[in-house]
Design a protein with these regions (language model features):
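Short, intrinsically disordered low-complexity segments
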Residues: 28-72
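Short glycine-/aliphatic-rich beta-strand segments at the starts of folded cytosolic domains
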Residues: 1-10
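Alpha-helical structural elements
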Residues: 3, 22, 32, 58, ...
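Short, flexible N-terminal segments of the mature chain
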Residues: 14-36
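Short, flexible beta-strand-to-coil junctions
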Residues: 9-13, 67-69
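Short, low-order "capping/linker" segments at domain edges
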Residues: 47-51, 74-90
């Protein structure tokens, strides 16, 4: 399994129609910020990208990136713990 970072322009999505929170609930995940999630999946970055893209406006930014250890970050304890537990080592 790999861990993917999904980050998108949360401000350009209608909160009532934001697909990302519903999509990530299908995976082991952690929310890192309003528009960023890490998910654990066997799916490819492009597959996840194409699942989300149709719901975003044309000018919204979307990135899906593979994550690995080591990493550096400043977040809540449960976010850091989740990343240390789930991220594979480089």
């Amino acid at each position: 399994m790999s861990v993917l970072l999904i980050t998108y322009d949360h401000s350009k999505v209608d909160p009532g129609q934001d697909p990302v929170p519903m999509l990530v609930k299908k995976y082991k995940h952690v929310q890192l910020s309003d528009g960023s999630y890490a998910i654990e999946t066997d799916e490819k970055t492009l597959t996840i990208f194409h699942k989300i893209l149709p719901y975003l406006s044309r000018n919204a930014h979307l990135f899906v990136v593979t994550l690995m250890q080591p990493f550096s970050g400043q977040g809540l304890d449960h976010e850091n713990d989740w990343l240390w537990k789930h991220l594979p080592e480089y």
